[in-house]
C-alpha cells in the first residue's frame, strides 16, 4: 500500500515538474516578447543576490507570476520595512491598489449587474409595465474573472504604473453582456423580468483589443498560472478591507436632521438649468431628497423601491439588505431610495425631459464613492478641484468623501448624505462628520452662485 502511494506520489511529482517546466517555457517565451514590468522585474532584481538560479526559477513560476498578476508582491514578499528601495515602496503602494481592485471584482461584478438590473426594471416600470418578479441568470464563472485579470494584465504588460483601479473597472464594465426579456409566470398575469448575464469569450475579447499572437500567448500563460496556483483563494484575504459595507455608513452617532415631507415626485422647478448637469442643481436635487425623506437601500439611485425590486435586492444582498428586510419594508418600501453615491448618480442619470433615471447616462459612470473621488483627483488639480476638508471652498454641489462613503455639500457648512439603511437621506454638519476630502465631480459643470 505504501509502495503504491509512494509510486503514485512520485508519478504525481514528475507530472507536476513536467507541467512546471512546460509553464516555465511558455512564460519565458511569452515574457521575452511581451516584457514583464513592475513587481516581477523589481522582485527579480532585488532577490538575485540571495537566490540561486533554481530557487529563482521556482520563485518566478510558483510565486511571482501568480501574485504579481493581481496582488502586492512587494508588500507580501518583502514588506514595507524590509526594502528601502524607493521604486519598490512605490510599486508596493500601487500594487495594493491594483490588487484591491482585482479582488473587489467579485463584488464589483455583482454590484454592476445589480445597477444594470435596477435600471432595466425602472425603465419598464416607467413605460407602464409593472414588474412582479426579477430573475437574473448569471452564467459567469471564476474562469471569467481569471481571464479578465489575465487579459487586462497582458494589455498593460504588467506595468503597475500604467494601470489603475479605475481602468480595471472600466475594462470589466466593458466585458459585461446582458439580455433582458419579459415573460408571464406560469401563464398568469404576473410579469417576470429575466436578465441573462453572459460569459465572456476570451478569444473574442482579445480580438477586439487587437492582441497579436504574442500577447494572446502571454495572456494564456497568465490565465493558466493563476488557475493552477489557486491564487485567488490563497491571496484574496489580503484585500478583505476592499469589500463594501452594504448597510451604509450608519455608525455615526452625532446630530442628524430628517426632512418633514414624504413625496416621490422630483420637482425640477428649483433647477437653474434642467437641460444640463451642474453643481447647483445637484445640491437642489439632494436637498429635495432630504426634504422628502428618501430611504437608503444599497444599489439604488433614486428609484422607487417596488415589491419586485425589494425582493431582488434581498436575494442579491442577503446580509446588507436581507438582514434589514423588516426595517426596509416598514420604512422605505414604495418610496424613493438611494445609497450614498447613488444619490449623486441619480441626479446625473436623470433625464429632465422624461423624468426618468437611466443608467450610466449623461457621461456619469457607475462608480462607487472611492472610485468617484479618485476619478476627480485624476482629472483635477489639488486645491482647485479637490483637497482636504479644511481647504474646501464655499461651493454648493461639491462631493464630500470619506473612505467608502460620499455626500453632497449644500453650502453653509451642511451636507446631504444617504447615510445608511436605518438613517436614510439626512442632513448633517460637515464639521465633526469625519469627511476626508472634497472634490468637483468631473462629469458636471460648476457654476457660480448668483
Model-derived features: positions:
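N-terminal capping segments
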Residues: 247-357, 403-405, 416-418
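Polar low-complexity intrinsically disordered regions enriched in Ser/Thr and small residues
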Residues: 21, 27, 31, 38, ...
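Lumenal/extracellular segments of secretory-pathway membrane and secreted proteins
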Residues: 1-18
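Acidic, low-complexity intrinsically disordered regions
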Residues: 143, 214, 238, 242, ...
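Low-complexity, Gly/Ser/Thr/Pro-rich intrinsically disordered linker/tail segments
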Residues: 431-450
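Membrane-proximal envelope biogenesis segments
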Residues: 4-8, 22-25, 29, 33-291
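Short, surface-exposed loop and linker segments with low hydrophobicity and enrichment for Pro/Ser/Thr
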Residues: 137-140, 393-394, 432-436
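...with weaker cross-activation on analogous glycine-rich loops/strands in unrelated enzymes
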Residues: 335-338, 345, 353-427
Amino acid at each position: 500500500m505504501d509502495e503504491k502511494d509512494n509510486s503514485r506520489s512520485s508519478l504525481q511529482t514528475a507530472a507536476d515538474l513536467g507541467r512546471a517546466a512546460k509553464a516555465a517555457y511558455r512564460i519565458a517565451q511569452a515574457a521575452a516578447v511581451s516584457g514583464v514590468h513592475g513587481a516581477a522585474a523589481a522582485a527579480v532584481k532585488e532577490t538575485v543576490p540571495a537566490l540561486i538560479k533554481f530557487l529563482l526559477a521556482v520563485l518566478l513560476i510558483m510565486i511571482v507570476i501568480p501574485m504579481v498578476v493581481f496582488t502586492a508582491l512587494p508588500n507580501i514578499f518583502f514588506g514595507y520595512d524590509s526594502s528601502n528601495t524607493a521604486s519598490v515602496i512605490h510599486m508596493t503602494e500601487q500594487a495594493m491598489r491594483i490588487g484591491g481592485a482585482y479582488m473587489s471584482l467579485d463584488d464589483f461584478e455583482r454590484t454592476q449587474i445589480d445597477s444594470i438590473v435596477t435600471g432595466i426594471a425602472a425603465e419598464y416600470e416607467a413605460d407602464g409595465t409593472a414588474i412582479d418578479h426579477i430573475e437574473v441568470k448569471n452564467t459567469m464563472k471564476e474562469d471569467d474573472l481569471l481571464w479578465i485579470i489575465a487579459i487586462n494584465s497582458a494589455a498593460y504588460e504588467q506595468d503597475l504604473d500604467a494601470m489603475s483601479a479605475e481602468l480595471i473597472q472600466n475594462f470589466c464594465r466593458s466585458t459585461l453582456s446582458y439580455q433582458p426579456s419579459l415573460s408571464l409566470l406560469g401563464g398568469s398575469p404576473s410579469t417576470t423580468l429575466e436578465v441573462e448575464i453572459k460569459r465572456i469569450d476570451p478569444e473574442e475579447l482579445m480580438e477586439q483589443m487587437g492582441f497579436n499572437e504574442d500577447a494572446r500567448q502571454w495572456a494564456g500563460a497568465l490565465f493558466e498560472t493563476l488557475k493552477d496556483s489557486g491564487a485567488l483563494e490563497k491571496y484574496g484575504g489580503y484585500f478583505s478591507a476592499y469589500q463594501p459595507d452594504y448597510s451604509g455608513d450608519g455608525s455615526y452617532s452625532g446630530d442628524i436632521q430628517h426632512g418633514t415631507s414624504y413625496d416621490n415626485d422630483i420637482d425640477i422647478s428649483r433647477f437653474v438649468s434642467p437641460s444640463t448637469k451642474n453643481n447647483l442643481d445637484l445640491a437642489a436635487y439632494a436637498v429635495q431628497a432630504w426634504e422628502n425623506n428618501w430611504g437608503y437601500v444599497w444599489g439604488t439611485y433614486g428609484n422607487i423601491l417596488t415589491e419586485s425590486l425589494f425582493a431582488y435586492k434581498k436575494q442579491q444582498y442577503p446580509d446588507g439588505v436581507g438582514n434589514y428586510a423588516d426595517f426596509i419594508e416598514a420604512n422605505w418600501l414604495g418610496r424613493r431610495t438611494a445609497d450614498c453615491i447613488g444619490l449623486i448618480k441619480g441626479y446625473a442619470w436623470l433625464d429632465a425631459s422624461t423624468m426618468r433615471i437611466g443608467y450610466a447616462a449623461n457621461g456619469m459612470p457607475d462608480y462607487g464613492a472611492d472610485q468617484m473621488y479618485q476619478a476627480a483627483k485624476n482629472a483635477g488639480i489639488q486645491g482647485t478641484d479637490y483637497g482636504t476638508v479644511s481647504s474646501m471652498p464655499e461651493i454648493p454641489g461639491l462631493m464630500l468623501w470619506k473612505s467608502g462613503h460620499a455626500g453632497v455639500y449644500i453650502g453653509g457648512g451642511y451636507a446631504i448624505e444617504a447615510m445608511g439603511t436605518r438613517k436614510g437621506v439626512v442632513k448633517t454638519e460637515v464639521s465633526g462628520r469625519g469627511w476626508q476630502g472634497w472634490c468637483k465631480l468631473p462629469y458636471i459643470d460648476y457654476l457660480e452662485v448668483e
